[in-house]
Regions:
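Conserved phosphate-binding elements of NTP-dependent enzyme cores
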Residues: 1-891
Length: 891
């Protein structure tokens, strides 16, 4: 990818290159036949708070065009259609709506500003009546001079020979009469001519029948019935990134900073009496709770019912106030008057957060944009739909012939992109989902769908584990997408460990045999059939069944040591209750979007942390977590980097480097020169090279060329001063030791028990190939997660600790998964409990207990489909996980 991208970028001008990602020339002799390359990574790099699924996939751009060109503006006052008329369209509507022979008058209104100007002039004058008469007279004379000699008021025609013929003081409900006609097909041209005069002189036309019925028309974009002005739909009106379209209150973000009632009432599943309103539980605010009790009695509000179960109007009364009760809003408004006190400002800050914008209700667009509809839905309403619902909406959308012709190509693009998103298994996401909240796998599949939608050909696509986050049920759809990319004329290169994807590949390149120092060789290249016959390939051994991840002979039994979540109702969780056994490996499974992360992260992890006073963010809704006191600690082991600087490395993370520094500080040379352990650290001044500050390299910015990272000239990349490098242990200096692999270091330091015990856990989790001083920035997400796992294993005891892992098999080969499961068993043997969110069937089949959520994603999920041992789940009808377990147990 680096070479394909580099060659393409080099073909651009120097000016253009400075805005593009800059690639180093890879260390390779020659690459022949390479195409321009696109890399679709497995991480979510989006930080923009405005970016959504719809904007990233370009669906939003097509929706903006669709609403601007084919949308119907509906007046938010009278709910009638707002449109701009022409004389021809108005004439056609009149002749269509009036039966033949119906007599009618063609009128235009005397503009309001004329009437207002006359009154305004009269008010300023000393003799108001005479001036008003003069102004009215002047206006009537101007009408006569233009040839308009008839007025119409209250169903009566007024012949105007001279100004004195008009007997009224104002022009309210007074119209200029242009023509009198009877509805018939042959009057169309005369009617068009009359309407042209109306639009030219008054920008509006009134058709009034002899029985008093009216038809109103205007050549301006206003509501003819209540006069409300509207913006003519243009694409930028529907952009929340444009000041023209964004809600002026929240500036297009959809939320504003204020009192977050989700923090004020953190758990609405408890009653007002039990302390649902968190600030009222403070002793200093006991008076406010008493006021609430008094108000509740007078308003007949049940204090013993969970707040969430109270009727909506009662909830609103509690929050926003009622007669005799200021409400929570009033309580915080009162606190605002006391903000000169520091403790009050600190107290209020605890309850401030981002809340839904009160003006646009979180829809991000101004009222004029929200008034435009297609198929009875506004653009924000469509964006709030799930991708599956949006796809159904546009597939069944019916429009009139004229609008259908305008929207034809736009609808084709929208439907095509929605179809691709459904096919990559993202149908449960909403179009308005913030891109920054997507998982790495979801972000990657959105990029994949976007690229497929662009229909590029002759391109090299490089994908890094696109199956991440996908349930086996959705894998076949993903493979179909990749095959479609190939079939339209692209090369698709996939880094993947998923067996089904490997079996579907046209050509397989196997690198190995093992990792690190023992890898980097081409083991095999060819098709799947030839791979199975390969003797040297570790991948082939697992595919053939020569090596396997074994199902345990017996599962750990469920004991009385359990955590029970009662009434979880966050996001799509449907008031579920679930039991999580401790002292074993528990897998939470289900299709993408079924609620796994919500249950484990937002409810269980956040709930247990909140109970310990270690959590300040919002917690998912639940009634109760029973058994939380059975665990002393809960630890989330994720795939975030273990460090963000080149000086961070695996041995510093697991505290093994302290022992290495002590070994060097204990040598005779170090003692003679009075060097202590800190002299062998590259994180603090003393022994490190101060030119590169212990990183071994210096970076030079090159503007439109790629930044150049040069080896430090002073220490020659060795990180330390020369006098520190002169200190040796068993003939090796600190730089040479840091360049050893973990396997080599175990043999080298075999006499240092304190160090060996920590290094061995890194080898136990399959990281023996890493170098001691390898920069944390070069580690993959899976490697970083296993380093964290090793640090917990190194502590020897994990008594009463609950470890939570989210897809720990990401980036792992079959052999690596085997090692990971061995480490999991060691953690449990040390007294820990493991809760793992996982799609990999090899891990799920080895679990002691499985909790399967679903049955579908999004609104179709959030239910407990099955719980039990893998064998029990395999026999549950309707469980997709059970279906694949059953297939696995049958082989």
């Amino acid at each position: 990818y680096a070479e394909g991208q580099r060659r393409y970028v080099e073909s651009l001008s120097a000016y253009a290159r400075q805005f593009l990602e800059r690639m180093d020339k890879p260390d390779v002799d020659e690459i022949i036949g390479i195409s321009p390359a696109i890399a679709i990574r497995q991480k979510n790099s989006t930080k923009n708070p405005r970016s959504t699924v719809a904007t990233q996939t370009e669906i939003y751009d097509y929706l903006r065009l669709l609403f601007a060109r084919a949308g119907t503006t509906i007046c938010h006052v009278c709910s009638r259609e707002v449109k701009k008329d022409s004389p021809e369209s108005a004439a056609d509507e009149v002749l269509t709506r009036l039966t033949e022979g119906t007599r009618f008058f063609v009128l235009f209104p005397i503009q309001d500003d004329v009437s207002r100007a006359i009154v305004k002039t009269a008010k300023k004058a000393k003799t108001r009546t005479s001036v008003k008469e003069l102004s009215t007279s002047a206006f009537l004379i101007s009408l006569l001079q233009q040839g308009f000699s008839r007025l119409f008021r209250s169903g009566e025609m007024i012949e105007l020979q001279k100004p004195e013929d008009y007997l009224f003081d104002d022009f309210d409900n007074t119209f200029v009469l242009i023509d009198r006609l009877a509805s018939a097909a042959d009057i169309r041209q005369r009617l068009v001519d009359s309407l042209e005069i109306c639009f030219r002189e008054g920008h509006a036309a009134i058709i009034e029948t002899t029985d008093g019925k009216q038809l109103k028309f205007s050549d301006r974009f206003i509501c003819k019935y209540d006069g409300t002005r509207y913006e003519e739909p243009e694409p930028h009106l529907f952009s929340f990134n444009s000041p023209f379209g964004a809600c002026p209150t929240c500036q297009g973000f959809g939320n504003t900073i204020g009192i977050d009632y989700g923090l004020v009432i953190p758990n609405p599943l408890i009653s007002l009496k039990a302390g649902a309103i968190e600030p009222f539980t403070r002793p200093t605010n006991a008076w406010a709770q008493k006021e609430l009790v008094k108000y509740a009695a007078s308003a007949n509000i049940d204090m013993n019912v969970p707040f969430a179960d109270l009727p909506d109007y009662q909830q609103n009364c509690v929050i926003y106030g009622d007669e005799g009760w200021r409400g929570l809003k009033g309580f915080f408004a009162w606190l605002e008057t006391k903000k000169y006190k520091l403790h009050v400002r600190v107290f209020r800050a605890k309850y401030r957060g981002y809340t839904k914008c009160p003006d646009c209700d979180g829809q991000r667009l101004r009222q004029a944009a929200r008034d435009v509809k297609i198929g009875k839905c506004s653009l924000p309403e469509i964006v709030e739909m799930s991708i599956a619902d949006a796809f159904t909406f546009f597939e069944t959308l019916e429009m009139d012939i004229e609008r259908a012709q305008i929207a034809d190509k736009l609808l084709l693009e929208i439907r095509r992109r929605l179809k691709f998103l459904v096919e990559v298994g993202l149908d449960y996401l909403t179009l308005g989902r913030l891109a920054a909240t997507l998982s790495g796998g979801e972000a990657q599949r959105i990029q994949l769908a976007t690229n497929l939608g662009s229909l590029l050909v002759g391109t090299l696509y490089v994908l890094d584990e696109p199956s991440i986050g996908l349930h086996p049920r959705d894998n076949s759809r993903l493979i179909k997408i990749l095959e479609n990319l190939r079939d339209i004329g692209n090369t698709v290169l996939v880094v993947e460990h998923d067996e089904e994807t490997i079996r579907s590949a046209d050509h397989i390149v196997d690198i190995g045999v093992h990792a690190g120092e023992f890898g980097g060789e081409l083991v095999f290249a060819g098709d799947f059939k030839a791979l199975l016959a390969s003797e040297n390939s570790l991948t082939a051994k697992y595919l053939r069944g020569d090596a396997e991840i074994k199902i345990p002979n017996k599962r750990r039994p469920v004991t009385k040591q359990i955590i029970e979540i009662v009434g979880a109702r966050e996001h799509n969780l449907n008031d579920i209750s679930v039991t999580i056994p401790l002292d074993m490996l528990v897998c939470v499974t289900g299709v993408s979007g079924s609620g796994k992360s919500t249950l484990v992260h937002d409810v269980l992890y956040a709930g247990l942390k909140k109970k310990r006073g270690e959590w300040n963010s919002p917690v998912g809704f639940f009634k109760e977590i029973k058994g939380g006191d059975l665990v002393d600690d809960v630890i989330l082991v994720d795939q975030s980097p273990i460090g963000r600087t080149p000086r961070s490395n695996p041995v510093t993370y697991i505290k093994a480097y302290d022992a290495i520094r002590e070994v060097f500080a204990g040598t005779n040379t170090a003692k003679t020169k009075s060097y202590n352990a800190s002299h062998f650290s590259f994180n603090v001044p003393g022994g490190r090279c101060e030119i590169c500050q212990g990183s071994g390299t210096v970076t030079i910015e090159m503007q439109f060329l790629a930044d150049v990272e040069l080896t430090c000239e002073d220490c020659r990349g060795m990180r330390f001063k020369q006098e520190i490098l002169d200190v040796k242990y068993k003939g090796k200096n600190i730089h040479e030791v840091l360049n050893m692999t973990i396997r080599e270091a175990i043999l080298f330091f075999k006499d240092v028990a304190k160090l060996i015990s920590r290094l061995k856990v890194l080898e136990a989790v399959g990281l023996g190939y890493l170098r001691l001083g390898q920069s944390a920035t070069t580690l993959s997400g899976g490697e970083a997660q296993r380093v964290k796992l090793a640090s917990h294993l190194a502590q020897k005891t994990a008594n009463n600790t609950l470890f939570i892992f989210d897809e720990p098999t990401t980036g792992l080969h079959f052999d690596d998964i085997n090692k990971l499961l061995t480490a999991f068993r060691a953690l449990i043997d040390n007294g820990g409990s493991l809760l793992v969110i996982e799609h990999n069937m090899d891990v799920i089949k080895t679990a002691d207990w499985v909790i399967d959520l679903g049955p579908e994603g999004g609104v179709g999920g959030g239910e407990i489909v099955a719980t039990g041992t893998p064998e029990q789940v395999a026999n549950v009808e309707g469980s997709f996980t059970g279906k694949y377990l059953k297939q696995m147990f049958a082989t």
